[in-house]
Amino acid sequence: MAPADGESSPPPHVAVVAFPFSSHAAVLLSIARALAAAAAPSGATLSFLSTASSLAQLRKASSASAGHGLPGNLRFVEVPDGAPAAEETVPVPRQMQLFMEAAEAGGVKAWLEAARAAAGGARVTCVVGDAFVWPAADAAASAGAPWVPVWTAASCALLAHIRTDSLREDVGDQAANRVDEPLISHPGLASYRVRDLPDGVVSGDFNYVISLLVHRMGQCLPRSAAAVALNTFPGLDPPDVTAALAEILPNCVPFGPYHLLLAEDDADTAAPADPHGCLAWLGRQPARGVAYVSFGTVACPRPDELRELAAGLEASAAPFLWSLREDSWTLLPPGFLDRAAGTGSGLVVPWAPQVAVLRHPSVGAFVTHAGWASVLEGVSSGVPMACRPFFGDQRMNARSVAHVWGFGAAFEGAMTSAGVAAAVEELLRGEEGAGMRARAKELQALVAEAFGPGGECRKNFDRFVEIVCRA
């Protein structure tokens, strides 16, 4: 409701709706923190809405208990997770299903009321949120507020989800027979093959919770979003991807990588926790001589593939730092850990401060699952990659790294010891790898320019703040 003549507008109250699974909420919180800092002069306040378990993890990760570590104009607001109280142990896919069912059944409207109550009755003036939580669109409309979704993955994957219906109509039930066919008839996707599409677009279980979620999201975004934040920077996406998205979503605002939004002295990476001594170990290694290996917190190769990877790292004769969940260590070849520790040629840890590791001058190659956050962290650090994708958008990301941007390689299927050794050797020292290393540095320079004074991502983030706060 507009203020009466002579009355000043109340300060903005932005509800930030998280998808409380995997790393989604943490990524959105980094944006909310940056938004809160940028919007403070306008008197804006932000309510960050997520489930109890999600908020507990965020508090632990950022040492934000009792509000410490959060800007004064950003508050956490707990919302129900949709799970029956009697169910103590619920598998994650079922948790997602219950959460989305609750959101669609009017839950987001109730969450916005909770945000209003937490803000002392201040009306929600804009709803920013993870694009996965598409029911926020209707809730925002009911509250008379614009919906500004945040997309955390790659632009090409977003385009594939928006075009799911036309892709299914084209490919039909022939996905298995057309795996290597380029998607030339779909604007923006000509660089990708049928096999690269995310699970649930033209193959896999269309009724799986994530497949249903992103399909509905892809249908909702073009008709309901006031603007869409993109986790990319000008010059990264191919022109056809950028043009196709601009035609479908006229108000795209690219200001990624999102982890670079916070000022250096405020970011978690300014003084990284390093309980396993990764950075000290890297300090004893040759410049650009180390292969860093990590497949994130969800993806994990099969036991036989883990052993092949370990054998390949040893065969490469390159020093390596491997972040691997401790429950997988018993699957490694006999004596592997002892040999690595005894010679000092390798370090296997249950967790590593990835951003700081990739920025370290000793790291020259990144063996990764090609999750989008990892890809962007590698890009912003200038490190070439060897990608072993597993699911979701990872295949599109790996294709982008190897064939669109040309700063790495991609395994087609499972890793072999010979393939790993060859990839690591090429990225670190190979003749063909020289072009990949140079291209990685070019992309790193583009990121630095985009986030420097007057850079395009800084300008775009300012525009995002204006869109969110002018409502």
Curated annotation (Swiss-Prot):
Gene3D superfamilies assigned: Glycogen Phosphorylase B
Classification of source organism: Eukaryota, Viridiplantae, Streptophyta, Embryophyta, Tracheophyta
A UniProt-annotated Pfam family: UDPGT
Entry EC no(s): 2.4.1.115
Pathway, per record: Pigment biosynthesis; anthocyanin biosynthesis
Residues at the catalytic site: H24 (proton acceptor), D130 (charge relay)
UniProt-annotated binding residues for an anthocyanidin: H24, H161, G392
Entry keyword set: Glycosyltransferase, Transferase
GO biological process: one example: anthocyanin-containing compound biosynthetic process
Assigned protein family: Belongs to the UDP-glycosyltransferase family.
Stated name of the protein: Anthocyanidin 3-O-glucosyltransferase
GO molecular function, one term: UDP-glucosyltransferase activity
Its biological purpose: In the presence of other necessary color factors, this glycosylation reaction allows the accumulation of anthocyanin pigments.
GN (gene name): BZ1
Class of this enzyme: transferase
Reactions the enzyme catalyzes: an anthocyanidin + UDP-alpha-D-glucose + H(+) = an anthocyanidin 3-O-beta-D-glucoside + UDP
Cited PROSITE patterns: UDPGT
InterPro entries: UDP-glycosyltransf_plant, UDP_glucos_trans, UDP_glycos_trans_CS
CDD domains linked: GT1_Gtf-like
Positions that bind UDP-alpha-D-glucose: T152, A352, Q354, H369, W372, S374, E377, D393, Q394
